[in-house]
């Protein structure tokens, strides 16, 4: 029993360390993004941020599920994508990118209010998520809330000057 408890505690501790390393790296990249001198530089930094966002910090199976959902979404299999993203959210409700992907698929399904609810979850977890901020602009435009859409795009631009 002691061995099982030790393994469980070790797993929780190491997962926490990986998440902290991930956050530190993302924080560093956002500093670099704000000071990028041109679009090409910003794009390289943005790609690194997306790589970190779409890779679960400690659970490879969730990264794979997210990728499977993304593939389904790209193939216009929106119900299958929605199910994959929901499964990821159920397994880790604190992973912003799972909420962001589901918000995207909900937008593509025309379920704008539900998409906005998921975007709210993303931004609660990661307020600098420029993908969610621009997605929010699209959702608010679809809902004819034009000032909210403009505000979302302005916020995205503050976070990502070359967006």
Protein language model annotation of sequence segments:
Residues 62, 96-97, 130-131:
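Helix-start (N-cap) detector for alpha-helical repeat units in TPR-like alpha-solenoids
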């Amino acid at each position: 029993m002691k061995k099982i408890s030790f393994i469980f505690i070790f797993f929780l501790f190491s997962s926490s360390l990986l998440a902290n390393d991930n956050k530190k790296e993302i924080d560093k990249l956002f500093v670099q993004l704000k000071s990028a001198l041109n679009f090409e530089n910003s794009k390289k930094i943005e790609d690194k941020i997306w790589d970190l966002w779409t890779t679960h910090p400690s659970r490879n199976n969730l990264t794979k599920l997210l990728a499977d959902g993304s593939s389904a979404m790209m193939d216009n299999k929106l119900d299958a994508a929605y199910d994959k993203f929901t499964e990821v959210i159920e397994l880790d409700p604190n992973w912003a990118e799972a909420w962001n992907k589901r918000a995207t698929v909900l937008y593509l399904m025309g379920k704008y209010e539900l998409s906005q609810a998921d975007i709210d979850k993303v931004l609660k977890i990661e307020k600098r998520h420029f993908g969610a901020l621009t997605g929010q602009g699209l959702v608010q435009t679809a809902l004819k809330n034009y000032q909210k859409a403009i505000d979302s795009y302005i916020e995205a631009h503050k976070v990502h000057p070359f967006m």
